[in-house]
């Protein structure tokens, strides 16, 4: 999807806020702990290359989801440590090794398949994934971990790290978290060979369970200034949302009582009303279930009336504003703010999804001033 620069809908990313957020977390974890910045999914919609370049000196490496995301960073000239968190196909190993990209190995079946296909692992950098209770990828016992590490080393791979992922670190109850932590720490203590880097802390763990940080953290959503729990848990320190989503009024008209607006004629004006049209829609990630939500115009909340279309929304205005007047979908206008978490609550989802769904059609612009 091509970025649409010739319309007013834009995502502005404040790189200085991302740097600030990283510093906030780093101040509250052990100084010896490495920081891996998670820039998968285009840095949660913020722009992977631009974010990585801005924070390169602040972190110890980057985490991505797949080989293509890792190659994007390499092709942009970023030669830092990169860990692919997902599982690679065996035929992708050679390219990862060539580009000095660390891969995740998550079970013996994958290793056996690689061996059967005679894929050369010599010189490959590996982190082993442990499934401590998430139920996705990873080894589930000390015996399996020991066998996998020994096999990888015999094949010439370098096992530099081992890690797990917590399912409920962003929840008030710590029962499941404690079970996972105990499983992982017990497994680590029983390894025949302990890799140098041991990491389990995602954003939520780094914030609310900082005393359990091992020797590295993986910072994702908090780096972009959002609460991993939504609003379920209070943040112990300030972080600043890094992304603003704005557009502008392209038409303003008066409709009369009884007039309908949008597909399906789902909205009927109860009296004479001023309706503004904004060029943003579900193709941009502003989804159809946001009908009835609001945006900000000149510091005023304005309801989205009628269905969200592919390319446009219609909003009820308190008065007839000039064409080109700024419309804030995510961000601050005057004394009022709409956060990605607010949008998520309306959609009954999580703030991660709201950011990741902002499509490539929305140009990203960058405020590069650093405070």
Curated annotation (Swiss-Prot):
Substrate binds at residues 136, 310. The keyword Isomerase applies. The modification N6-(pyridoxal phosphate)lysine is found at residue 40. It comes from the Bacteria. The keyword tRNA processing does not apply. Its EC number is 5.1.1.1. The active site is at residues 40, 263. Disulfide bonds: none annotated. GO terms for molecular function: alanine racemase activity; pyridoxal phosphate binding. It catalyses: L-alanine = D-alanine. GO terms for biological process: D-alanine biosynthetic process; peptidoglycan biosynthetic process. Pfam families: Ala_racemase_C (PF00842), Ala_racemase_N (PF01168). It is an enzyme of class 5 (isomerase). Its cofactor is pyridoxal 5'-phosphate. GO terms for cellular component: cytosol. Pathway: Amino-acid biosynthesis; D-alanine biosynthesis; D-alanine from L-alanine: step 1/1. Keywords: Isomerase, Pyridoxal phosphate. Catalyzes the interconversion of L-alanine and D-alanine. May also act on other amino acids. PANTHER family: ALANINE RACEMASE, ALANINE RACEMASE, CATABOLIC-RELATED. Belongs to the alanine racemase family. This is Alanine racemase. The lineage of its organism: Bacteria, Bacillati, Bacillota, Bacilli, Lactobacillales.
């Amino acid at each position: 999807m091509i970025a649409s620069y010739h319309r007013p809908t834009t995502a502005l990313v404040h790189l200085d806020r991302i740097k600030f957020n990283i510093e906030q977390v780093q101040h509250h974890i052990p100084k010896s702990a490495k920081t891996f910045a998670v820039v998968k999914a285009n840095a949660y919609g913020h722009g992977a290359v631009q974010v990585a370049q801005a924070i390169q000196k602040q972190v110890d490496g980057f985490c991505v989801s797949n080989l293509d995301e890792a190659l994007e960073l390499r092709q942009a000239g970023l030669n830092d440590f990169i860990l692919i968190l997902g599982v690679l196909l065996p035929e992708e190993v050679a390219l990862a090794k060539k580009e000095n990209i660390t891969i995740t190995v998550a079970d013996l079946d994958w290793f056996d398949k690689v061996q059967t296909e005679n894929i050369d692992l010599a010189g490959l950098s590996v982190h082993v994934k442990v499934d401590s209770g998430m139920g996705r990828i990873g080894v589930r016992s000390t015996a399996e971990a020991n066998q996998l590490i020994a096999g990888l080393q015999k094949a010439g791979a370098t096992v530099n790290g081992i890690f797990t992922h917590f399912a409920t670190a962003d929840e008030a109850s710590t029962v499941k978290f404690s079970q996972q932590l105990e499983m992982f720490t017990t497994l680590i203590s029983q390894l025949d060979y302990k890799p140098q880097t041991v990491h389990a802390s995602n954003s939520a763990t780094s914030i609310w369970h900082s005393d359990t940080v091992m020797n590295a953290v993986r910072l994702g959503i908090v780096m972009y200034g959002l609460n991993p729990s939504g609003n379920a848990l209070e943040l112990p320190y300030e972080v600043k949302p890094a992304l603003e989503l704005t557009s502008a009024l392209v038409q303003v008209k008066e409709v009369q009582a009884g007039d309908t607006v949008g597909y399906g004629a789902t909205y009927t004006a109860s009296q004479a009303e001023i309706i503004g049209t904004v060029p943003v829609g579900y193709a941009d990630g502003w989804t159809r279930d946001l009908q009835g939500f609001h945006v900000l115009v000149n510091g005023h909340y304005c309801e989205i009336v009628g269905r969200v279309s592919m390319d446009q929304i219609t909003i009820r205005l308190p008065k007839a504003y000039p064409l080109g007047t700024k419309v804030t979908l995510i961000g601050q206008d005057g004394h009022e703010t709409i956060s990605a978490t607010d949008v998520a609550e309306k959609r009954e989802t999580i703030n991660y999804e709201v950011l990741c769904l902002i499509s490539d059609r929305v140009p990203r612009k960058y405020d590069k001033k650093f405070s």
